[in-house]
Amino acid sequence: MKAVIAVFITLMLTAVVAFQPAASFSAPKCAGKMSMAIEDAPKKAAAAALAALTTLSVISPSFAITKEELRSLDYLQVKGTGLANRCPEVKGTDSIKVKGAGQEIVDLCIEPKTFQVLEETRNKKGELSKEFINTKLMTRQTYTLDGISGDLNVVDGKIQFTELDGIDYAATTVQKPGGERVPFLFTVKELVAKASAGGNTIAPGFQMGGKFVVPSYRTGLFLDPKGRGATTGYDMAVALPGIQSGVEGDEELFRENNKVFDVLSGQIEFEVNRVNLEEGEIGGVFVSTQGSDTDMGSKSPETVLLKGIFYGRIADKE
């Protein structure tokens, strides 16, 4: 009886922490220390961030919850606790050998812990520089990707994961220190992640990464406040034709009136730090960079940097 009570108390404490997954990581009043040109060196930036994440403990072990513990809970025990937005912890430092084919990663869960946006700032000398600034998360408990699956193969002597299915996108909004909000579609659609080194073994320290597709935040049927859309709605707002006189201002109005379904790209890097051979589980940290919402072509996308944890399970195909 005492053991059951202890487990229940641990789960309740986990639920309390789950409601504040990014609070201690995204203080809006201070700028991040990471300053880089992410377009020129995404892999170098991701490697540095991965090293920092690996050094620090992203989740306190006392509040971590395993997949087995999650499975033991029913719907009412999970409802309203935030646990559904959490990735499980993996216990163990084993290693798993990947077959050449016939295997897949299932139940892949990707949970961001920090959200930063690339911003142009001016220092005391008046010099302009770009650096990632911390933001405040405005989205509640619906920003974690879960249930993702895909093929796991060995291609050209390196392990490769190809994403195929699952809840692989989540509409998310963050707020900059000045109050400006940045919506973006957190995703790993069509991800092809390759190992950084050769071999067929996944063990602590294993790294892989690759590019993915970032669809438009809005679909073609979306209408803006003036009733304009990509596939339906008005062609332009009332009284705007008179402003479009063939001189300055036409380009801005054209982008506002002509909605497009922008498809961008992103880059993600994973590093494994826990492996459970018996359950086939792997866990670790990730760093991802991608573009933000373009308001269907009327705005330039901002660069968003996300860092957090992931969980996955290696299984044979049925």
Swiss-Prot record:
Keywords: Chloroplast, Membrane, Photosynthesis, Photosystem II, Plastid, Signal, Thylakoid, Transmembrane, Transmembrane helix. The chain crosses the membrane at residues 45-65. Induction: Expression shows a diurnal pattern of oscillation across the 24-hour light-dark, with increased levels during the light period (at protein level). Down-regulated in the late stationary growth phase as compared to the early stationary and exponential growth phases. Belongs to the PsbO family. It is a single-pass membrane protein. This is Oxygen-evolving enhancer protein 1, chloroplastic. Disulfide bonds: none annotated. One of its GO terms (biological process) is photosystem II stabilization. Residues 1-18 form the signal peptide. It comes from Chattonella marina var. antiqua. It comes from the Eukaryota. Stabilizes the manganese cluster which is the primary site of water splitting. PANTHER family: OXYGEN-EVOLVING ENHANCER PROTEIN 1-2, CHLOROPLASTIC. One of its GO terms (cellular component) is photosystem II. It is found in: Plastid, Chloroplast thylakoid membrane. It holds the Pfam family MSP.
